[in-house]
Amino acid sequence: KAFAFTGKESYRSNFMLPATIRDNAPYTIEAWILNPEIAENECVADFTSSHDELEKLMLVNGTEPRCGVMNHYGWYEDAGYKEMKTLEGKWQHVYVCFDGRIESIYINDKLISQKDIQLLVKPSQFMLLGKNAEEAWPFSGYLHSLKLWDEYIPYKRQTK
C-alpha cells in the first residue's frame, strides 16, 4: 500500500520543521518510493520552505545527475544518481543520513553519494509532499513511507 501521486496534487503540513533541524544539525531521512516513469526533477518531499542557497532539505526522485536525489540549493552539496532511470518501475529504498559533516545517501543498499557538506537550514513554515515549496517539480509515483529524524542514524543494510 502506498500514497499515489499523479503530479497534480501536493500535501502541505500545518506544522513547521522541528527546531532541532536547523543550521548544520544532523538528520536522517528514509523513504520507500516507486516511480513508473522518472522525469528529470520530481520532488517527493520538501522539508523546508526556504528558497536560499544551502537552506533546503528536499528529497527528489529525478534523473538530473547533479541534484536528482537530494537538493540543498547548493551545487556541490546536492546529490544525483546517474543510473536513476534504471530504477523506473522498481521500489527504491532511499536512505539519507547526515552527521553534521558527512551526508551519505543510499538507494537499495548501494552508497550513491558521500560528501563533506555544510548546510544553513533556517526555520521552515511548512513541509510539502508531491512538489517543492515553489509548487514545481511535481512527483508522479508512489510513496509507501517517509520518515525524518532529527538525529544521525547510520545506515544498516536491509535484511530480506
Put a short name on every predicted segment:
Residues T6-V69, I102-E103, E134-P138, L148-T159:
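Extracellular glycan-recognition modules
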Residues M16-A19, G80-T86, D116-Q118:
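Beta-strand-rich interaction surfaces with strong enrichment in secreted/lumenal proteins
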Residues G68-H93:
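Short, aromatic/His-centered strand-loop micro-motif at the edge of beta-sheets
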Residues K90-S104:
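Localized edge beta-strand/strand-to-loop motifs within extracellular or lumenal beta-rich domains
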Residues K115-L143:
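Flexible glycan-contacting loops in extracellular carbohydrate-active proteins
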